[in-house]
Amino acid sequence: MSAVNSKTKFDEGRLMQVLVAPIVSEKATMIADKTNAVTFKVLQDATKFEIKAAVQLMFKVDVQSVAVLNIKGKTKRFGKSVGRRDNIRKAYVTLKPGQELNLGGESA
C-alpha cells in the first residue's frame, strides 16, 4: 500500500501549506532527542502521506514514519463570556537514522 502512495504526486502549493509551524516545547525536545522525531502543527485535513511529502520537499530529509493526533480545543472563560480555543492537529515525524533536522537556526 505504501509503495503505491509514495509514487502519488501532490500539489506543491498544497504541500507548502500543510506544515503550519514547528512545535518547540519541553516534551517535543525530549522526544526529538530520544527518537529522532520532529513535532509539527499541521492543517486539520492533512493526511500522513501529505505530511511526509511536505517534510521531504521542504527540508530535504528522509522520513521513516508519521504519527498524527488531534487535540481538542479547551473551553476558556473571560469574565462572563465563554470562548473556545481552536482544535489542533499535531504530527510527530520520525526521521530515518542518520538524518537530522535543525529547527533552532543555530549552526552546529
Curated annotation (Swiss-Prot):
KW Acyltransferase (keyword) present: no
Highest taxon in the source lineage: Bacteria
GO CC terms in record: ribonucleoprotein complex; ribosome
NCBIfam families per the UniProt record, alphabetical: PRK05738.1-3, PRK05738.2-4
Record's subunit section: Part of the 50S ribosomal subunit. Contacts protein L29, and trigger factor when it is bound to the ribosome.
Keyword Ribosomal protein tagged: yes
Gene3D superfamilies listed in its UniProt record: 3.30.70.330
Assigned keywords, A-Z: Ribonucleoprotein, Ribosomal protein, RNA-binding, rRNA-binding
Listed name of the protein: Large ribosomal subunit protein uL23
Function description: One of the early assembly proteins it binds 23S rRNA. One of the proteins that surrounds the polypeptide exit tunnel on the outside of the ribosome. Forms the main docking site for trigger factor binding to the ribosome.
Family assignment from sequence similarity: Belongs to the universal ribosomal protein uL23 family.
MF terms in GO: rRNA binding; structural constituent of ribosome
Gene Ontology biological process terms in this record: translation
